């Protein structure tokens, strides 16, 4: 097994894990998977590519603008496609699935018509590069190291956030929504905040992924599927689960691609997902709770 393939799998797994974290951020206070997260990842990458390549803007300023724009788009999605459904007094069922998928199709179709299907090459931020250096028998680039570092920073930031008052309120809603509301916690306000933060983070994931996977309309569906797989493998709502699930997925994908034809990579990852869910339906780090009524 080539060590370089393992490194590439780990780095791809970090991108999948970060995508899964954006799904979990919104899921915890709302019990809703925003399937438009993949489109937000793609839009972040496309805005960034347009600003850097077309507008000749600096990498860091373009990243800031792209993240802000995607956060605002995520706010609009919350106001139009999620909040009106989950606030229904009769219950929302799974209506959010249809609404967020509809938003996904609208956004992807709009971006595809505006910029076309051709992928755009995005440079990594200076002084990072995609040039490989031989380290312990593996080819590693400075940008790959940067992605791993960003994932570690995201874990630390989320751990810190959930230890604060607002984060603790989100965890309380995730644990027992009714009891949290009796304590004066507003699920709607926290859902709005989580949607903005999750959307902005999705835009940043798109920026991180673009130098490796190129900025294109197809980037969104690919990372949405992989991010959802990471969450399902690791356990819904679990930060640790999304991270470990994403890394397992990326490494397994790389190993499968090196041993078999690359065309079987998706089949290999879905087989892994199916196997884990057959053994542990709640995921590796998910929990099952029985509620007395």
Language-model features: where?
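Inter-helical junctions in multi-pass inner-membrane proteins, predominant
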Residues: 1-9, 161-167, 194-231, 255-265
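Short, non-helical or kinked segments that cap or interrupt transmembrane helices
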Residues: 25-44, 59, 90-95, 169, ...
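Cytosolic-side transmembrane-helix boundaries in multi-pass membrane proteins
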Residues: 119, 175-182, 186-189, 259-293
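Transmembrane helix-bundle core of multi-pass membrane transporters
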Residues: 84-85, 92-163, 190, 255, ...
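Membrane-interfacial amphipathic/re-entrant helices at transmembrane-helix boundaries
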Residues: 1-19, 47, 60-62, 89-97, ...
């Amino acid at each position: 097994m080539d060590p370089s393939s393992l490194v590439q799998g780990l780095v791809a797994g970090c991108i999948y894990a970060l995508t899964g974290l954006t799904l979990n951020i919104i899921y915890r206070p709302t019990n809703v998977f925003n399937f438009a997260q993949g489109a937000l990842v793609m839009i972040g990458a496309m805005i960034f590519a347009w600003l850097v390549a077309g507008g000749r803007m600096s990498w860091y300023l373009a990243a800031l603008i792209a993240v802000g724009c995607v956060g605002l788009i995520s706010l609009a999605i919350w106001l139009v496609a999620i909040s009106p459904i989950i606030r229904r007094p009769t219950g929302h069922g799974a209506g959010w699935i249809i609404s967020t998928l509809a938003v996904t199709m609208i956004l992807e179709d709009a971006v595809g018509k505006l910029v076309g299907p051709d992928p755009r090459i995005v440079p990594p931020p200076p002084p990072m590069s995609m040039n490989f250096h031989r380290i312990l028998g593996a080819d590693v680039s400075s940008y790959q190291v940067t992605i791993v570092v960003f994932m570690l920073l995201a874990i630390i930031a989320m751990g810190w956030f959930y230890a604060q008052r607002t984060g603790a309120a989100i965890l309380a809603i995730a644990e027992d929504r009714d009891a949290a509301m009796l304590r004066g916690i507003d699920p709607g306000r926290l859902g709005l905040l989580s949607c903005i933060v999750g959307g902005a983070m999705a835009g940043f994931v798109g920026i991180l992924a673009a130098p490796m996977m190129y900025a294109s309309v197809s980037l969104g569906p690919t990372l949405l599927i992989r991010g959802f797989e990471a969450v399902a493998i690791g356990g819904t709502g679990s930060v640790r689960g999304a991270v470990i699930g994403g890394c397992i997925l990326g490494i397994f994908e790389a190993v499968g691609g090196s041993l078999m034809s690359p065309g079987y990579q998706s089949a290999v990852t879905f087989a892994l997902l199916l196997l884990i869910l057959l053994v542990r339906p709640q995921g590796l780090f998910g929990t099952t709770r029985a509620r007395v009524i």
